[in-house]
Every structure is written in C-alpha cells, then in structure tokens.
C-alpha cells in the first residue's frame, strides 16, 4: 500500500515536508514525489508499484494545465472500460489516472 501525505492551511515554510514524506517510505519503497502550491498546500506520495511500473504512473498526477492535482491509493479494476467510455486519452497504464 502506498503512502499519502497532504498538508493544508499552514505556511509550508514552517514544516519539514521532506521528513514527513520520508516517514512514509516503508509504505511505498519504490519511489516518492511531491508538490506544493502557493506555499500553503503540500501533497506527497510514496509509491508501491503494482500496475504501471513506469514513471508515467507516478503520483501526484496533474492535468495538462496543472489546475487539478490528485493522489489515489486504490484499485480501479474497470479503468480501461471507464477510459474508453469517456474517450479519455490515458498517458499511463495506471488505473488511478481515470
């Protein structure tokens, strides 16, 4: 199971984000990534690769214009069907992208 951290409502300068993300390493030993927005929203993710082992499946994921960001730890078994139904052009093989 992957690790997820989200921090909001505080000035990020006052928080050791890297330390918090590192504490989740046992939950997702394959990779980690994070991003922050406007110095008051932070999202971090430690990855346990299952479906898409490439970097394309890494999270947090963002849409093309970076107005929407998401992290998901789950299994969407019919993700190919959902993507086809909604004509969604997937960039990865990750079920969470839909």
Each model region followed by its residue ranges:
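N-terminus-centric sequence/structural signature that marks the extreme N-terminus
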Residues: 1-98
